[in-house]
Amino acid sequence: YVQESISKIPKILEELAGLELEPPRWHFIGQLQRNKAKPVAAHFDLVETVDRAALGAELDRRAAEAGRSLEVLLQVNLSGEPQKGGVDPEALPALLAASRAWSQLRAIGLMTVPAAASDPEASRPAFARLRALRDALRDAEGGQALRELSMGMSADFEVAIEEGATIIRVGTALFGARAP
């Protein structure tokens, strides 16, 4: 999805030209492989899916090459589903510690994708757990950083907001389902 996303940026900027708006902040959402770090570091402002130290280090290197700084969210796998990205909750403190070595990246929060469910309430335990993880890490850090919680999508964003989401992902609700 990296190239697809990057190709849409000029079109969106063209549509926004002439409007008195703050410039958009581009978020990259989706599993990211290290070999795609260069274009992501060059075009996006926030990467929501950093789930391993090696990926963060590569993004950091590529951001430095591009003369940019990026914000990142650390993705946590709370569903236990191997096909979903994210660090295991037990390994999250180590990933946060590794993030301190990144000079061009700043970890500003956490992100999760809960297990798919037809009832939005089924996502509540995962959202509450992510908030609890964030709060525990913030307490351990003396209240520093980790201000964002990206959780909730088109089907369950109301529950996510009730549980403290600061970023929701509602592309399907806004734009419809992706083409196959």
What kind of feature is each model-predicted range?
Residues 164-166, 171:
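Active-site-proximal glycine-rich helix-loop-beta segment
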Residues 180:
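Active-site loop ensemble at the mouth of alpha/beta enzyme cores that anchors a bound cofactor
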Residues 2-157, 161-163, 175-177:
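Conserved alpha/beta-domain cores
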